[in-house]
Amino acid sequence: LGAFFVGLLLPFSVIYIKNLLDTKIKTRLDVEKNTSIPFLGDVPKSTSSNQIIEINSRSSTAESLRIIRTNLEFLFNNKTNDLAKTIFVTSTFPKEGKTFLSINIAATIALSGKKVLLIGMDVRNPKIDEYIKVPSTGLTNYLTSTNKDISEFIIKQDTFDQFYVLPSGVIPPNPAELLMSKKVDDLFEELKKNYDYIVVDTAPVGLVTDTFIVAKQADCFLYVVRANVLDKRMLRIPEELYHEKKLPNMAVILNDTESTKGYGYGYGYGYGYGVEVEEKKPWYRRLFNF
């Protein structure tokens, strides 16, 4: 009989220990337990081959992006001028999906009839060209030029009426110094007059200082955390940035979640709106909390 109970408990023990040792972020609850940063929404793992949201898409990824578009307006409650709303997107490390989300947040806003500019400002490691077709010239070429107009480097996305892109351009030898130039300030001053929204794909904050250099241009910062990739302990980085106010008006987006975990009506409402849909688990999963 003892051997029977040992055999019965052994698999549960293995599962429990495995769960105990797994420190990766899984759900919204993991983010909220480890940070005090407002939670804007989560984006389920995409099952579509399309890299950019389409107007008729009804996938869980597309719906989550529409909810994030709605929730974004709460971040602009204190904005008093009529200039473009500037949304900066960053993460702790590369490969957390910030470029994917930058492009799709810009596309989702453009589908609502707003004039949107996407800027590639991760000039050390540009990735926009992996998702959409853009020229090799762009922001850095403009910043190093003396007689070029910014309009020469901005392109319109063919399948959108109001979606424009300023690519990163060639990788410069001195990215930090380039981003510190007054020409960047003048550029944003000009662009804010011509668009409704500006979405900026910036560098990961865990690696370089580039994002902090341009942070003053942002109305809000979306901090992307990728589920099953980032360690919970790494959340101390955005938490410190939030409390030290190094990135203005921060909110977290949890990317690449399992669609059965936390996705449902109102799942993305990080400001107390809607009802969280909880996944129903078997008794043994509830017992061991995995």
What is the meaning of each model-derived region?
Residues 143-171:
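Nucleotide-state-sensitive switch-loop elements of NTP-binding domains
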